[in-house]
Amino acid sequence: MCIRDSCIPLKWSANKRDFEPNETNEYNQIEYHEEYLLFANELDDINRTLDSIHGPAKLINAVFIKLLAGCGVREHQDVPTGRENIFSKTRRYHIPIITNPKVYMKCLDTDYYLEKGNVYELENTKNHGVRNESDIDRIHLVIDRLPY
């Protein structure tokens, strides 16, 4: 396993524990990073498309995540720690940007190849991990949506 993958946040909710989208308070702010403006139209298009498939939702997180060649992320669960935890309320999607058939997303003891050109929903409260056995860096756009 490598030290850490790298990421470029575009839009990010600052508070993961007590996130309540219908309230505005210091713990509930969504940060818009400078890079967001470069992809705002595309993110809106993606969100509208997912609205038509899964119903309306607010896009609250968007981040590009790079997993270096030969690296991985150990299996883990993004465990809700309380009733208001963000992971118990959102739906997470992976959109492969650069990938390889030797990059494996493992979820509940099954390996998957997430192919470029598709959108995948990941229930991240379930056991999951990833390993990049290829010789290229993998890049995904990962978004979290909060259903209305």
Sequence positions of predicted segments:
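A short hydrophobic beta-strand segment most commonly corresponding to one strand
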Residues: 91-96, 119-121, 135-148
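Conserved double-stranded beta-helix
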Residues: 9-98
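Short, surface-exposed beta-strand-loop junctions and turns on beta-sheet-rich folds
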Residues: 81, 111-113, 137
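A short beta-strand-loop-beta hairpin characteristic of the jelly-roll/cupin
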Residues: 90, 96-116
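Short beta-strand His + acidic residue motifs that chelate non-heme Fe in jelly-roll/DSBH
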Residues: 76, 103-105, 122-123, 127-135
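Extracellular structured ligand-interaction cores
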Residues: 59-61, 90-94, 102, 127, ...
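Short, small-residue-biased leader/transition segments that mark boundaries at the very start
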Residues: 1-3
